[in-house]
Amino acid sequence: MQDAITAVINASDVQGKYLDSSALDRLKSYFQSGELRVRAAATISANSALIVKEAVAKSLLYSDITRPGGNMYTTRRYAACIRDLEYYLRYATYAMLAGDTSILDERVLNGLKETYNSLGVPIGATVQAIQAIKEVTASLVGPDAGREMGVYLDYISSGLS
């Protein structure tokens, strides 16, 4: 896992250069948004179960996927879906704090789409639930932090699509 600081420094180091004004601007932006990201992470951590519960109610609960024959019909499948959504929220929060998507590639997206396809997990419904997580999260953390968190939830959605 990288963070924004490591990514900026590594990019300059690979070129054997000091940090240029663009790199310093990226670091400045990262540090300026630090308090916002930490407050958002605290709110998300304190409300993670509520976020997932509301997202499921918004996106999946009354759809065909939860009816007999649907991919979330049995209690075991439903619990697995909830577990996965909690996992996406947690890792998106880590990525937001780090200001970098590498943890999402390493720990979430690497092979996930293929696994879901082989198990018959409906990717469209999963993406819909992730977008609902984004909406619910934004309503709790506010518009600025919601946009920041949305970047990482959208990254997961794009990686699955």
Curated annotation (Swiss-Prot):
Q: How does it sit in the membrane?
A: Peripheral membrane protein
Show the coiled coil region(s). Answer: none
A matching Pfam family: Phycobilisome
Protein name as annotated: Allophycocyanin beta chain
Lineage of the species this protein comes from: Bacteria, Bacillati, Cyanobacteriota, Cyanophyceae, Synechococcales
**One GO CC term on file:** plasma membrane-derived thylakoid membrane
Tell me yes or no: is Membrane among this UniProt entry's keywords.
Answer: yes
Q: Give the organism, scientific name.
A: Synechococcus sp. (strain ATCC 27144 / PCC 6301 / SAUG 1402/1) (Anacystis nidulans)
Describe its partners and assembly state. Answer: Heterodimer of an alpha and a beta chain.
Alphabetically list the UniProt keywords: Antenna complex, Bile pigment, Chromophore, Electron transport, Membrane, Methylation, Photosynthesis, Phycobilisome, Thylakoid, Transport
Residue numbers carrying N4-methylasparagine: N71
Q: Which domain of life is it from?
A: Bacteria
Mind telling me which PANTHER family this protein's record contains? ALLOPHYCOCYANIN BETA CHAIN (PTHR34011:SF3), PHYCOBILISOME 32.1 KDA LINKER POLYPEPTIDE, PHYCOCYANIN-ASSOCIATED, ROD 2-RELATED (PTHR34011)
